[in-house]
Structure formats: structure tokens, C-alpha cells
Amino acid sequence: TGLFPEQAVNWDLVRGMIEGADRPVKVLNLFAYTGGATVACLKSGAQVVHVDASKGMVQWAKENAAASGVADGAVRWIVDDCIKFVQREIRRGNRYDIVILDPPSYGRGPKGEIWHLEDNLYDFVTLVQQVLSDDALAVVLNSYTTGLSASVMQYILEDVLVRQMGGSVSADEIGLPVTETGGVLPCGATAVWKGKDGNS
């Protein structure tokens, strides 16, 4: 469908951080797909760099931004390999206050490189740490990969980000409420690192 309503909890979280900050907030949305998080951040006044390797998905995200009334927001739409983009941003010295990651379980890079989330996530988070501003607010990591639990994601964020930058990490399954039964339909996992400025 291109819409992930279970992510609303994360959208609310980052919107609260953006609106509560006493400064402009730069957001990097990686593997950004159809742009739900991008739209949420734009609605709160952030500057957003939206990156996805699929031209079609980026176009869909632009349409979603227009339908949501934020097409004129401070956004750059980038069609690129997310790993290569982050590596270039490190070299350029560009820094972000919030990074949102929604990486696929499996994929291929532009030169046939194979991506397995379980094998590559730790190294990728290490790259992401290098594009965080000194007073970064958050890193939000989502996964729909069955072999990657919330506790493993929490460990990775703690080992890479808390060790280097302080702050704290929380992680949990995310899901959708089921009206008929009162239960919750599991829909993946999320882990959130909050920097010192993101904990206020």
C-alpha cells in the first residue's frame, strides 16, 4: 500500500522533538520509501533530506507531500543508494539532528552488492553516527525483518551511539490495534536512540 500506519508512533515522536527544539532541525530520512516520515517532519518545520534508491518511490513521496500540503517545505528529494549517500555526506561534512532508518531486509546495490540487514546493519549505524550533529536529537531505526528483534536493534544502537555520544536507547515491537479482539497485530520493531538534547 505504501502506507505504514504502525509508524505513527515514531512520526509523533520525531514531530515532538522537532517542535520542542529551540533551533532549526535537519532530518535525514534513509530508505525513505513513500515519505510518511518525511511528511511528518516537514509538517513540524524541519529541513528534510529524503533518500531512496527507487526513483518511483521518490516520485510517490513527492506526490504524498503535495497531497499533505507540504510540497513547498524545506526538502531535498534524492534518488541514490543510501550507503553511498551517507559516505558522501561524511566526506562533505554535512550533519543531521535526526536520522530515520527503515532499511530493507535484503537488496542489491548499484554494482550488484548484496545487502542483508542482519549482516550490514551494525556497520551502517556506524556510518550514520558520523553524520550526526554534536547536539543530535535522535536516530529512529525500524525493521520488518523477522530475524532482527527489538533487543538486537537496541544493542546495536547502544554499542555504537551511546558509547560514542551518550544518550539512551529504547526499543519495542510496533503494531496496529485490532478493534475486534482488543489485541495488537505485530508489525515489526523499532529502536530509538535519543541524544542528550532529545531526552528533554
Listing of model-derived features with the role each one plays in the protein:
Residues 34-48:
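Conserved SAM-binding loop of SAM-dependent methyltransferases across substrates and taxa
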Residues 22-33:
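Conserved class I S-adenosyl-L-methionine
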Residues 32, 52-56, 120:
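Short beta->alpha hinge that forms the Motif I/post-I loop of the SAM-binding pocket
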Residues 54-100:
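S-adenosyl-L-methionine
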Residues 120-134:
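A short glycine-rich, Lys/Arg-flanked "PGG" loop and its adjoining helix->strand segment in the class I
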Residues 1-22:
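SAM-dependent Rossmann-like transferase core, predominantly class I methyltransferases
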Residues 104, 110, 142-146:
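Short strand-turn motif at the edge of the Rossmann-like AdoMet-binding core
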Residues 136-200:
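C-terminal catalytic and target-recognition region of SAM-dependent MTase-like enzymes
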